[in-house]
């Protein structure tokens, strides 16, 4: 039985992106950070829950900071240097995620709040009685 000629394993070439966008979705229960290129194609992402935090600890600013650091380090493999930040939601991880991206070494060029505001749309949830 003849062996087929073995192919040498080709190293996957990652595209180099200088400018990127960071989308931070900060809800009351979790924080999701996605780093994309200019066209919106995802390069890396991380969540508070995926970073090892469970339950009520997912919604802390520290959990958002750890998630932002993980997403930022993963996106550095693509050569991202500058980030434009889009923040959505009222959660506690908004500011700490931006600070964490800054501490990883990105130059933040712009911060935009894209939280959706209803024009008297859906009825909000009832107030909690504790």
From Swiss-Prot:
The keyword Secreted does not apply. The keyword Nucleotide-binding does not apply. GO terms for biological process: translation. One of its GO terms (molecular function) is rRNA binding. InterPro entries: Ribosomal_uS11 (IPR001971), Ribosomal_uS11_bac-type (IPR019981), Ribosomal_uS11_CS (IPR018102), Ribosomal_uS11_sf (IPR036967). Keywords: Ribonucleoprotein, Ribosomal protein, RNA-binding, rRNA-binding. GO terms for cellular component: ribonucleoprotein complex; ribosome. Gene3D superfamilies: Ribosomal protein S11. PANTHER family: 40S RIBOSOMAL PROTEIN S14/30S RIBOSOMAL PROTEIN S11 (PTHR11759). NCBIfam families: PRK05309.1, uS11_bact. Located on the platform of the 30S subunit, it bridges several disparate RNA helices of the 16S rRNA. Forms part of the Shine-Dalgarno cleft in the 70S ribosome. Part of the 30S ribosomal subunit. Interacts with proteins S7 and S18. Binds to IF-3. Belongs to the universal ribosomal protein uS11 family. This is Small ribosomal subunit protein uS11. The gene is rpsK.
